[in-house]
Regions:
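Catalytic core of pol beta-like nucleotidyltransferases
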Residues: 1-28, 34-40, 49-104
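Short, well-ordered beta-strand segments
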Residues: 45-47
Length: 104
């Protein structure tokens, strides 16, 4: 079943990469969409892992750009630097890397 989901995921990826392009980050798609089990109304989970200092406004700016887009799904943006280490490792192992490289 492809109800346009692939196009919307491409749009989420393009927005994230555009906003985050100047910064040393790795962007991941994780959760049900990455595992291929997402349902029609499932949200989209992306994680951002910084490999240097980021401006405080950056992730709120990314969230705003995603909210203002035509993507009909809620997009959760997770800062991997602010989560439990076990969760961070699970994302690193199970997610799809959209940009950057694994460090650490």
């Amino acid at each position: 079943m492809n109800d346009g989901t692939d196009a919307y995921l491409r749009q989420v990826r393009e927005i994230a990469l555009r906003v985050l392009a100047p910064y040393p980050v790795t962007v991941y798609l994780f959760g049900s969409r990455a595992a291929g089990g997402g349902r029609r109304l499932s949200d989209v989970d992306i994680a951002v892992e910084s490999h240097g200092a980021l401006p405080r406004h950056l992730l709120p700016e990314l969230r705003e750009a995603l909210e203002e887009s035509t993507v009909p799904y809620h997009v959760d943006v997770v800062d991997l630097g602010a989560v439990d280490p076990d969760f961070r490792e699970r994302v690193r192992k199970e997610a799809i890397i959209w940009s950057g490289s694994r460090i650490g």
